[in-house]
Amino acid sequence: MLLMLSDKGKYASATENRRFVWAEVVWPLILELNDVAFTLKQYQKKRDEVCSKKNIDIAMTSRGLVSLMQKEILLKEDHLYSIHFRLIPYMRLKANCDYATAIHEVRIK
């Protein structure tokens, strides 16, 4: 699913990493915990499960997590990562919130 940087441009690769981390690690973790925030340990446990199941390098997912913070989909405060407040209704409904929906909600003023 994830390609090396040489196969795609820098921006396409970053977007793909963000999409993967959001869809496979972060959003399922949020729904599993039924909470707007998670710790680094919780993220790492979920990431390790997904990476071993899908045979993905952990480095790809760490870049995706940082990228989600840069896009302000995830916010980091001390040792907690939390989702943007506009995504909380999706969590409460246990709705599917793909990356496109998340980025759209965050960018709405």
Regions found by a protein language model. Give the residues of each.
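Short, amphipathic alpha-helical interaction segments positioned at domain boundaries
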Residues: 87-109
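Short acidic, hydrophobic short linear motifs in intrinsically disordered regions
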Residues: 35-49
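Short alpha-helical segments that sit at the start of domains
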Residues: 1-37
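Minor-groove-contacting beta-hairpin "wing" of winged helix-turn-helix DNA-binding domains
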Residues: 79-86
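Short acidic, glycine/proline-enriched loop segments that cap or flank alpha-helices
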Residues: 52-56, 90-92
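Short amphipathic alpha-helical interaction segments
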Residues: 54-70
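A short, conserved structural fragment
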Residues: 69-79
